[in-house]
């Protein structure tokens, strides 16, 4: 876990502690089901325990940690039912903005998106799944920005703690990693041809694919999930 640069303002310290812990949970550096110590995190981050406790309270509201009196704080396990609901939000918003995105997308924008895909390929070659996730986010975020729907992206980015951790798990697998890059290449061809129907279908499949692979993930990482029985509900 990275350390924090000391700040002069208490609010800056609080925000940085919250951000670092949240990023480590999202990246599975703090694995689902892991018990986390306020004292140990405070020491690692070189801060007092107060901002760590405050961060835990905020993260509990986001369903990323569970705080149990007398027992401590645990990183929330991945809830597949919640992940499916988060997927629905993303799919609904992202498919809705496609007409505006295609309308506003220019040749320089296309070049920018293609460059992001090239960087994603480099991540695949270098086996850097977390860097790929960041580039994947940038790729899809540009859809929203070019559509003039930045707020919708903020909604997607702030309401996907369980779905996002599924994404991180899926790209640990080389075949899935490569498949995600190839889907982006297909999307780019559809964007260039302004084929909105094909793009909508491909994007829908792209977003749902992670949920579709839940059974494999349950077998590989059973301790990361709230209950192994949840796959029967989806």
Where are these regions (language model features)?
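Short linear motifs at protein or domain termini
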Residues: 1-103, 211-234
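Short helix-capping and inter-helix turn/linker motifs at the boundaries of alpha-helical repeat units
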Residues: 12, 110-111, 175-178
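Mobile beta-alpha loop/short-helix "lid" or hinge segments that flank ligand
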Residues: 61-66, 159-161, 176-177
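Short, flexible turn/loop "capping" segments at secondary-structure junctions
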Residues: 66-68, 136, 179-181
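Short alpha-helical transmembrane interface motifs in multi-pass membrane proteins
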Residues: 79-80, 166-170
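Conserved amphipathic alpha-helical segments that form helical-bundle/coiled-coil interaction surfaces
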Residues: 86, 107-168, 182-189, 197-209
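Short helix-capping/hinge motifs at transmembrane helix termini and TM-loop junctions
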Residues: 102-103, 148, 172-173
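C-terminal regulatory/effector modules of DNA-binding transcriptional regulators
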Residues: 176-234
């Amino acid at each position: 876990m990275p350390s924090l640069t000391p700040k002069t303002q208490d609010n800056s310290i609080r925000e940085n502690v919250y951000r670092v812990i949240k990023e480590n949970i999202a990246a599975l550096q703090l694995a689902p089901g892991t018990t986390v110590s306020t004292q140990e995190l405070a020491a690692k981050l070189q801060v007092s325990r107060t901002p760590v406790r405050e961060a835990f309270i905020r993260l509990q509201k986001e369903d990323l940690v569970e705080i149990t009196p007398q027992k401590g704080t645990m990183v929330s396990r991945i809830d597949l039912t919640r992940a499916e609901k988060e997927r629905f939000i993303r799919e609904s918003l992202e498919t809705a903005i496609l007409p505006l995105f295609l309308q506003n997308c220019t040749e320089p924008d296309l070049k920018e998106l293609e460059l992001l895909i090239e960087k994603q390929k480099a991540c695949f070659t270098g086996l850097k799944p977390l860097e790929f996730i960041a580039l994947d986010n940038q790729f899809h975020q540009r859809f929203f920005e070019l559509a003039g729907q930045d707020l919708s992206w903020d909604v997607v980015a702030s309401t996907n703690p369980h779905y996002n951790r599924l994404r991180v798990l899926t790209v640990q697998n080389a075949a899935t990693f490569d498949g995600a890059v190839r889907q982006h290449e297909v999307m780019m061809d559809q964007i260039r041809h302004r084929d909105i129907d094909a793009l909508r279908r491909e994007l829908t499949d792209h977003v749902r694919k992670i949920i579709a692979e839940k059974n494999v993930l349950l077998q590989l990482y059973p301790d990361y999930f709230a209950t192994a029985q949840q796959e029967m509900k989806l």
